[in-house]
Amino acid sequence: MKQLIMEMEEYASSKNVPIIEKKSIAFIMKYIKDNNVKGILEIGSAIGYSAILMASAKEDVFVTTIERDEERYMECLKNVKKCGLDKKINVVFQDALDVNLTEDLKFDLIFIDAAKGQYTRLDAPISFSSLTISTYLA
C-alpha cells in the first residue's frame, strides 16, 4: 500500500488535486486509534487518499466518503479497489449538499475535506436520519 500512497501523492501533485497534508492525516490517524473510532463520514473524497489512510488506521474502521466530481470519484474507486479496501470504504458519487443518508448509521468522526469555500453551506443542509455523531473535524 505504501507504493500506492506514493503514486497517489505524485498524481495529486501533477494534476493539482488537493490532498490532506501528511501532518494532518497523521493527527487524524492517531485520533482514530486513540479514540476507538469505527465509523467515519468523509465529505470530499478527491482521489481517495485520506479515506484509504483513515480506513487503514485500524482493522475495524469503516469509511463512507462522498465525492461530487465524476473524474475524482472514478479515480477514488480505482485507488480503493487497488489497495484492497473496497470492503472498508463506501464511495458515494453525489454532491454532499444533496446526500440523504437515511439508513441507521453511526459515525464517530465526520471529516469535511470538500471545497473550502462551501463549508458554510455544509452545516445544515445535509440530512441525516438516525445518525449519531461523536466528533466533527473540518
Q: Could you tell me what each predicted segment is?
A:
Residues 1-109, 116-131:
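A short alpha-helical cap/connector motif
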Residues 133-138:
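Conserved beta-strand signature within the Rossmann-like core of class I S-adenosyl-L-methionine
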